[in-house]
Amino acid sequence: MVEAFCATWKLTESQNFDEYMKALGVGFATRQVGNVTKPTVIISQEGDRVVIRTQSTFKNTEISFHLGEEFDETTADDRNCKSVVSLDGDKLVHVQKWDGKETNFVREIKDGKMIMTLTFGDVVAVRHYEKA
C-alpha cells in the first residue's frame, strides 16, 4: 500500500500552516521562510524501508524507517523526536513525540493528489501536493 505514495510530490497549496508552526513553537523568522517555501517530497521504498526526502530552498531532510517501528527524527525546525510511521488503511500516519508533546501527519491520496493533514492539539493544517 505504501506504493501509492511512492512518487515525487510538489507542494501546491497550504492552509493554516503558519498557525500550526506557531503552535509547535517555531520562531517568527523560521515561520516566514516555512510559509513561502514550496518543498518537494520524494517518497520511496528501498528494500524493507520507506524513505521520505523533503527538499526545499530552506532545508533538506531525510528519514528512513520501517513501518510501525519507532525511530529518532530531527525535524526541519530542529526538534528531536521519537517518531513512528504506519499504514492505517489507505493512510500513511506519521506521529512525532518530543518533550511530552505529540503531533501527527496523515497523508492520503485523493484524485491523484497527496493530501497531508497536520494536527497538533486543536490546530490543524492541510497541505496539498501534486506529482512533480
Swiss-Prot record:
A fatty acid binds at residues 127-129. The modification N-acetylvaline is found at residue 2. InterPro entries: Calycin, Fatty_acid-bd, ILBP, Lipocln_cytosolic_FA-bd_dom. One of its GO terms (biological process) is fatty acid transport. GO terms for cellular component: cytosol; nucleus. It holds the Pfam family Lipocalin. One of its GO terms (molecular function) is fatty acid binding. Keywords: Acetylation, Cytoplasm, Lipid-binding, Transport. Disulfide bonds: none annotated. It is found in: Cytoplasm. FABPs are thought to play a role in the intracellular transport of long-chain fatty acids and their acyl-CoA esters. Binds oleic and palmitic acids but not palmitoyl CoA. Belongs to the calycin superfamily. Fatty-acid binding protein (FABP) family. Monomer. PANTHER family: FATTY ACID BINDING PROTEIN. This is Fatty acid-binding protein, brain.
